[in-house]
Amino acid sequence: MSKLSNVMTGLSFGLVLILSQAGASDVLSSPEQTNNASGGLDYANAIPMDIRATFSEAAVQRVTEPVSFGEPGVSPGAKGNGEKLHEYLGEVGTVVSMQNVAVPSEHGTANRPYATTRVDMFGQRLSRKFPNRITGKLFFKKGTDTYVCSASSIKKGIVVTAAHCIYDNSADKFYTEWEFIPAFYADSKVGLKAPYGKYKSLKAWVPSAYANPTDNVVNDYDVGVLVMKKRPNPDTGTNMYPGERTGFYGYGWNGWGYTNGLNDGSIGLIHQLGYPVSHDHGWQMQANDSQAEKVTVNLGSGNTAMAIMIGSRETGGSSGGPWLFNYGQIGALSGTSAGTYPNNDIVVAVTSWGWGSDDPKEQGATPFTDANVKLVVDGACSDTPDRCD
């Protein structure tokens, strides 16, 4: 049995990752979250979620057998109205100096080039601008401790993140008290800020194949969604879901946007967003660009898992952050035309795991399929359609 090391608490647990197709009913939802009071989360001292693989890098392989899924699909995003709330969350103690230039392309021992840099540069708070503002930090409780991941909106009231930021399959139970803060920002001058407000969750959804403690499926199903509550603006009287203010990304599944679907060797250009604590203490949004490749991970004993691999310097705290195709806004075209899969700002995976060693500078993610992301989004939207219409 292959093992992953869960470094968020220093504990280890065995995980077997197997490739299978989930049925339409194979989803698990949390109890409704009834705590609407503020003050229960420790924003300044939250512990980053961080899943690290301890199997050999040689386990990453490329196989020739084609992978069969349904047709590629996509659900488009929207811009939102941009209304700010400017909530203050408390003080911080360590000075963060501004970085004014993007870093050059680099790579680790995995030989996957990447460029990781702050989103905010040249004194400009670009993290508050569309489409960056759709991404944010996700705080939640594991017992009495506050943990943190990254996340983003993919419907006006639906937030996507990694399943391991929602469900503890070592204890076979959901975490609690999730709170999403889009465009989170902090430094020693302004403290901890929520420019578009903070949003509590109503309920969480994960694939049952991930939650099943017997199978311990992770890589093929490490994606989940949160159904959010509205947040009132005391200045304007409006009451909105996060995606109504910040906008929301689209999402694609079953190989949407890749050069050869979900077959091994298929590639795409990923723009990754998140809040790794290894960069600016996790106070500022980081962006990473890298070519993604679909591979098969050989876990031994006949078990394999799908993975999308990129080069990245991001670490713990980036879990659940979006991996996007076609990031930004296409210009007015003249004398040329858009290529295949031209939709902008489409999430096709979320940050899932990295290696135990820092040397590879590589991260892996579950590719979105109709057996994971579409399954949980459809379940959440069927249960609470007002978050999705």
Descriptions of predicted regions:
Residues 344-389:
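C-terminal cap/linker of serine protease catalytic domains
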Residues 1-11:
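Bacterial N-terminal signal peptides that target proteins for export
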Residues 24-150, 379-389:
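Protease-domain processing segments flanking chymotrypsin-fold serine proteases, especially trypsin-like
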Residues 138, 151, 157, 161, ...:
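Terminal peptide-recognition signature
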Residues 10-20:
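Bacterial N-terminal signal peptides
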Residues 111-133, 139-148, 154, 175-238:
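Conserved catalytic-core segment of clan PA serine endopeptidases
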Residues 312-350:
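Catalytic nucleophile loop of clan PA
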Residues 219-311:
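Chymotrypsin/trypsin-fold serine protease catalytic domain
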